[in-house]
Amino acid sequence: MQIDFAPSRQSTLGVEWELALVNARTGELVSVANDVLKGVAANHPDLNEDDEHPHIKRELLLNTVELVTGICETVKDAKEDLSRSLAAVREVTDPMGVEVFCAGSHPFSPPLLQPVTDKERYAKLIERTQWWGRQMVIYGVHVHVGIDHRDKVLPILDGLVNYFPHFQALSASSPYWAGEETGYASQRALMFQQLPTAGLPFQFETWEAYESYVQDMFTTGVIDATSEIRWDIRPVANLGTIEMRICDGLATLEEVGAIAALTQCLVDEFSSILDAGGSIPTMPPWHVQENKWRAARYGMEAIIILDAEGNEQLVTEHLAETVSRLEPVAAKLGCSEELADVLKIIQRGASYQRQRRVAAEHNGDLQAVVMDLVQQMRKGPDA
């Protein structure tokens, strides 16, 4: 089948931020997304689009709302867009006694008790995936970056895969699941890949090979729409982007900006390499798979595989080197401050580390963990 890629202005940006809705007193998940979205639409009738705010959307579960930016030139623009949408949500949730937070999962609310949004595509997903599908109490951050030519898409995607463990370690924020300590920095990473077509992307030499794969998925009934290919990094042909979907939910706007800047800078660097006639190294799938597991298990303490030769390094050390290398790219893109925030995450610890510290300080009380995440979203990561 033919998949037309609609080129975008190179390195333009879009960000999606999935937020959990919780009881402001108990920290438990509350399934009030429909009420929240109705309230937002009523407060902003001039923005309604099919009875829905164009930047505040439903998700799989009724305990979730998703903030979606427009097309942005800079990370600063994206952060401002998300901040406006978050304020619109709070206009409704504050009087309801509902708080919002973001992490890769909810530390203690039971997954199987969470109602699903009443949409046909979600009903089909749950019908097909059953127990695994009903476990998806997970939240993430997705970053779209515009690509100006179809032939760049797959090489850039492969390049981003090399940085999978970097994104996973920085964002890891789901050490708890249904009240239990999992021993993993990111339970979400291993949970989400249980869905059909989710997980690591395949490597394709040509766009035609990718088209052939998608055709096979349609022919065999695996998918009914291209959007049902839920890879951790994927092309989005109709938008003209690559979508980086690796990350666990991020607790603060500062951290969202850091991840967006790292994504934008890497994509822009890869694009420039290709424009200059260069190539982007890839790693064997077995190294990529191992890197994903290591980052999910060990987070910021992961020793990651760097290349096809099997060289290894502590992920935080390689992150610091990567940020230094990308500083000229960030200056060009206007995101130097946000890229530097990657180093702040390394210094203060990723969310999973902060959650464990809070739990230890409160004798294992996971309600305290949720309330701390709530305050971080309101006041920043140093709250």
UniProtKB/Swiss-Prot annotation:
It catalyses: L-cysteine + L-glutamate + ATP = gamma-L-glutamyl-L-cysteine + ADP + phosphate + H(+). SUPFAM superfamilies: Glutamine synthetase/guanido kinase. Keywords: ATP-binding, Ligase, Nucleotide-binding. It comes from the Bacteria. Pfam families: GCS2. Gene3D superfamilies: 3.30.590.20. One of its GO terms (molecular function) is glutamate-cysteine ligase activity. Its EC number is 6.3.2.2. GO terms for biological process: modified amino acid biosynthetic process. Belongs to the glutamate--cysteine ligase type 2 family. YbdK subfamily. ATP-dependent carboxylate-amine ligase which exhibits weak glutamate--cysteine ligase activity. This is Putative glutamate--cysteine ligase 2-2. It comes from Paenarthrobacter aurescens (strain TC1). The lineage of its organism: Bacteria, Bacillati, Actinomycetota, Actinomycetes, Micrococcales.
